């Protein structure tokens, strides 16, 4: 079974950046978000994971940059939009901009009734981001605790969530390897598909994630590993096939 790869473009203050463990102020600047996204599309990406960090942290938004990327590249690549989608207005804006899928994080923890209603309305165009420390969820740009992972999943499964994007916060941006045990635990407890995020540092990490494909881990987000040139996207795509 093949693995779908989603190169990440995280946008802060109009620039493409990478954070360490999701901490505000830890970013490394990688220049134009549009150029970053175009680089991954030209290298063969079928999906881009596009994140508005300012919206996630509540420090503004980068809607103009995100809209440009979707407008210019949306006919060549599927875009998963994430960051600050917490209500009808922000969700509608993301979908109207042309996102193929929208990733809901904090709202799923703070407003479960709303999350249930949009899952029912939009189906597989809505994924839920589960950002985890141990078995505890992190919320609002990872600055607060949001409850037990498996209790939250039980509720989301009951309302028909079709995909979880699972990030071990301790691993993200650290190039220390993914939390395979966490991914296995999540995938074994749900019929929803699972996207792995955080910690991928070498091609063997992708091979390890690919072994979980048969239990529902069908995709992986690539961030720091690509920007730090640990491997090329072409090399990663060859492993993921």
Curated annotation (Swiss-Prot):
Principal location class: cytoplasm
Gene: hisA
Subcellular location: Cytoplasm
Enzyme Commission designation: 5.3.1.16
Organism: Bifidobacterium longum subsp. infantis (strain ATCC 15697 / DSM 20088 / JCM 1222 / NCTC 11817 / S12)
Xref: Pfam families: His_biosynth (PF00977)
Similarity field: Belongs to the HisA/HisF family.
GO MF assignments: 1-(5-phosphoribosyl)-5-[(5-phosphoribosylamino)methylideneamino]imidazole-4-carboxamide isomerase activity; phosphoribosylanthranilate isomerase activity
Protein name from the UniProt record: 1-(5-phosphoribosyl)-5-[(5-phosphoribosylamino)methylideneamino] imidazole-4-carboxamide isomerase
SUPFAM superfamilies the UniProt entry points to: Ribulose-phoshate binding barrel
């Amino acid at each position: 079974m093949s693995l779908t790869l989603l190169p990440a473009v995280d946008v802060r203050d109009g620039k493409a950046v990478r954070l360490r463990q999701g901490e505000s102020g830890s970013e490394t600047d990688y220049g134009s978000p549009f150029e970053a996204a175009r680089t991954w599309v030209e290298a063969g990406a079928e999906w881009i994971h596009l994140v508005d960090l300012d919206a996630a942290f509540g420090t503004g938004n980068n809607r103009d940059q995100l809209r440009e990327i979707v407008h210019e590249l949306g006919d060549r690549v599927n875009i998963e939009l994430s960051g600050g989608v917490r209500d009808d207005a922000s969700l509608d804006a993301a979908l109207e901009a042309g996102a193929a899928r929208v990733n809901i994080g904090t709202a799923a923890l703070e407003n479960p009734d709303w999350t249930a209603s949009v899952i029912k309305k939009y189906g597989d165009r809505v994924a839920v981001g589960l950002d985890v420390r141990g078995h505890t969820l992190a919320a609002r740009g990872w600055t607060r605790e949001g409850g037990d992972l498996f209790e939250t999943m039980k509720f989301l499964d009951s309302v028909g969530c079709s995909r979880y994007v699972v990030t071990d916060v301790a691993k993200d941006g650290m190039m220390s390897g993914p939390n395979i045990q966490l991914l296995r635990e999540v995938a074994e407890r749900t019929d929803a598909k699972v996207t792995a995020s955080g910690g991928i540092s070498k091609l063997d990490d992708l091979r390890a994630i690919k072994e979980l494909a048969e239990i529902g881990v069908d995709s992986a987000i690539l961030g720091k590993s690509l920007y730090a040139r640990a491997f090329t996207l072409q090399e990663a795509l060859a492993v993921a096939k």
